[in-house]
Every structure is written in structure tokens, then in C-alpha cells.
Amino acid sequence: FVRVILTLISLLVFSSCSTNGISSNQIGKSRFLFLQKELPNISEKSDEISSINFDDQSKVIIWMHGTDRPAIAGNLDCNDDMPPESLMLAANKLDISLYYLCSNATDSGIKGSFIYKRVLELEETINLFNEAGIKPHNIYLSGFSAGGWTALMAAKAIPRKFNKGVLFAPAFAGPRYETRFFPVWRKIIRPKQVKEIIKAEKLEFLIFAYEDDPFNRPIELEFLIKKDEPFPEIVGYSCKKGHFTYRKDCEGKKTYERIIKFFQASEF
């Protein structure tokens, strides 16, 4: 019943956003899924960040999708892993633009390097938003799987470039069951990146993790928790949907409410 209500609300929300720069039918590139209300001078090229005149109060969430296999580019249509209803509804309610950052970064022979490339892509995108008028404290990150992991790595690499973020099943280095076949990923490369992440000055993230996730269950993400620090907040549960729970979230209403509360704590 709750999911039906959320779906109906989302249909109303996104039909009402058609004049706010939604470009969901434009695939093949990074793009705005929707823009905040009443932005001036919206052009047909509104997917170009530089074409929009943001004001001092403008806010944006940068969404980062997952990576299937880092050896090859796999998101050529730039339409994989769209944000969940909970995030889109929250962004719309709070009048925050939502931007889909498409990446086809690959390892190019150096295992794990695709994550660093994705962090660089993120930094370049943030710089464009800065030039368009959005300050770092009004930039938020969100992502699924490797997109969420990219946000964690960004907390160490570019901590002053964004405010905080909401992550869904952040993961890197493949599922646990592949460890015996490809041990280098989870025994060498993942620990190396974990060491980098935990050196971050702050990890202000709301993280949704799933007990039946073959990649990272809540317990595999406990390395993020620092004593006496309120964040990151890890919300763990199971909908029997594994890694892709965020798509059909049995706790969708609670997820939405948590996201709203998390963002509202940012002096909205």
C-alpha cells in the first residue's frame, strides 16, 4: 500500500516538473533529471550546467550510478541505475535539482583505477556547478554501488567540494563470493581504498545497506563508523531484494522520511 502511494505521488511530482528542465528522455549523456522550480533563462540546452543561471540558494544532488564490470564501458546509453523514488521525491519536495552524472570510466589495465577516474569526473562536474553559481555547501552527493563508493572516496580526495550525501548499497571490488576466484580485489585493492576512506576528515553520509547484499552488508561497512561521531549513519535492513533493494524498497516510506530529515538538517 505504501509503495502504491509513493508511486502515485512520484507520477504527480514528475508530471508537474515538465517545465522545470526534466530531460529523462534524453539519454547518452550526463543530464538533469529535474531542476529546481522557477529558475530563470532555462534553455533547450538545459542539460549543460553552464547554460543555467543558478542563484545563491540553489542546491543540487549529483547522482552516481553503479559500475557493472570495470574492464569495459557498460553504461553507454547513460541510463543505468536511475535514482530511487525515495530520493527523487525528497529532492523534489525540498526543491533541489537532481543531476545524473554518467560515467564509463574503466580500469584500463590498472585494477581499481576506475574509482579514481570517477572521483576526477565528479570533481570536474562540481567545478562546473561552482562556476554556474552553486556553492560547495549546497552540493550533495548520492549514488548506488560503485557510485556510492565513489562518494566515499571523494570524502577523502575532495572533502571541501561538497556538503554531504545519501548512499545506497555502496560497494567496490565485486561480491563476496567471488573472493576465492579473484582474491586481489577484496583482499588487496579494497583494503587499500578502505584505508584512504577512513582518513577522511568527515564522512557525513546517510547510508542504506542491505542485510542480504552479496557485496556489502551493514557489517562490511562498519569500518566507516568513528567513535563519538554522529555520521555516517548506516541504516540496515532486508527486503529480500539483495544489492538492488533500492529499486523496490519495502521500507520506501521510511527511506524517504530519513532522507528528508537528513537534508533538512543542512539549514534549509
State where each predicted segment sits:
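Alpha/beta-hydrolase active-site loop
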Residues: K111-A132
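The feature captures the conserved acid-bearing segment of alpha/beta-hydrolase catalytic domains
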Residues: P170-G236
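Conserved alpha/beta-hydrolase
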Residues: M88-S108
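Classical Sec-dependent N-terminal signal peptides that target proteins to the secretory pathway
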Residues: F1-N20
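Short, surface-exposed "cap/lid" segments of acyl-processing enzymes
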Residues: I52-A90
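Primarily recognizes the serine-hydrolase "nucleophile elbow" in alpha/beta-hydrolase
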Residues: H137-R190
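A domain-start/cap signature at the N-terminus of enzymes
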Residues: C17-K59
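C-terminal catalytic histidine-bearing segment of alpha/beta-hydrolase fold enzymes
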Residues: E229-F268
